[in-house]
Amino acid sequence: MERIPSAQPPPTCLPKAPGLEPGDLSGMDFAHMYQVYKSRRGIKRSEDSKETYKLPHRLIEKKRRDRINECIAQLKDLLPEHLKLTTLGHLEKAVVLELTLKHVKALTNLIDQQQQKIIALQSGLQAGDLSGRNVEAGQEMFCSGFQTCAREVLQYLAKHENTRDLKSSQLVTHLHRVVSELLQGGTSRKPSDPAPKAMDFKEKPSSLAKGSEGPGKNCVPVIQRTFAHSSGEQSGSDTDTDSGYGGESEKSELRVEQPYFKSDHGRRFTMGERISAIKQESEEPPMKKSRMQLSDDEGPFTSTDLISSPFLGPHPHQPPFCLPFYLIPPSATAYLPMLEKCWYPTSVPVLYQGLNASAAALSSFMNPDKISAPLLMPQRLPSPLPTHPAIDSSALLQALKQIPPLNLETKD
């Protein structure tokens, strides 16, 4: 312990003061020295008591801090990972406490909601009175489930209609599989769709076959006139100026027209049957040949085509063949209005060198030596006609020149 300097004896090295004897100190006052000594001793004792008090208090504080740190470390380990990822870097103690508080609040809200639902269900079951909305929802769910089940049963039966060894266990297995697919999140069908019938599955192949009978990819229908004109203009399909493609106005006109047309015999034909001429687009343009290079065998049409032509048989829905004006002499052009009005309802048939049967048939009743002028408008010839010997185009032109001109003012 620290000693007070006044209480210590003087050092031995210092010599005693001369002339100081105990008798001389009797008259001196040492009261101030006693007071100082007493006060110092009291201060020392108070400091010792404080040190003895701080020592256990520090230990207690250290233990308390250790417990707090341990609890914060455990909270950090118990926090969910998604909350830990919201912060970057090291999680401080304050951040851990904030995240813990947030997580506890979320759990408390969830528990409160579940508790409210449980109370509502218990009150509803006790009262035994369900609201009308819940009843309607239950009925809709039942109806949708029943329709889905019936649809699956019909589809399964239609698919396995021909199988004789169909068992109920197979149907039940199929329904269980469908239910599992729906529960797993598969796309459920709309309950408003009507249940398919077995006839629908039978009609599908026929409809597919009908769809495949349409025109090909590269086929474009040629635009034709569907009615015969009473004027002297050339009717039919104009292949010199027609490109095979119609504009918007022509498309709208075709949509407005009636889809059915009546023939002379009363039979109705659709637009697809009337337009039988198809122009096919090829990659390379065909080589053009002059009319003088065409032989009898290489004519534009064969005898089978002539038999099925509208001139030789009653086929009003087939496209007519037209005769260009430059092949008819001027004297014969006067007969075009009469022929177009009375003799044939459509355009004049074509006359070329390769058409042996048509040229012979036309010359047989247009020759004035055999048939008179009033008989130039006969009825339609039956198909097919007997084959006549071929004649030259010059002979045909001479026969046309010999026909006497008719009066254009004659009534039909």
UniProtKB/Swiss-Prot annotation:
Residues 1-139 are annotated as: Essential for interaction with BMAL1, E-box binding and repressor activity against the CLOCK-BMAL1 heterodimer. There is a cross-link at residue 279 (Glycyl lysine isopeptide (Lys-Gly) (interchain with G-Cter in SUMO1)). GO terms for biological process: circadian regulation of gene expression; circadian rhythm; entrainment of circadian clock by photoperiod; negative regulation of DNA-templated transcription; regulation of circadian rhythm; regulation of neurogenesis. Its main location: cytoplasm. Residues 142-175 form the Orange domain. One of its GO terms (molecular function) is protein homodimerization activity. SMART domains: HLH, ORANGE. Coiled coil: none annotated. Ubiquitinated; which may lead to proteasomal degradation. Residues 1-21, 182-256, 279-298 are annotated as: Disordered. It is found in: Cytoplasm; Nucleus. The modification Phosphoserine is found at residues 235, 383. There is a cross-link at residues 167, 279, 288 (Glycyl lysine isopeptide (Lys-Gly) (interchain with G-Cter in SUMO2)). Homodimer. Heterodimer with BHLHE41/DEC2. Interacts with TCF3/E47. Interacts with ubiquitin-conjugating enzyme UBE2I/UBC9. Interacts with HDAC1, SUMO1, RXRA and BMAL1. PANTHER family: BASIC HELIX-LOOP-HELIX TRANSCRIPTION FACTOR, HES-RELATED (PTHR10985). This is Class E basic helix-loop-helix protein 40. It comes from Bos taurus (Bovine).
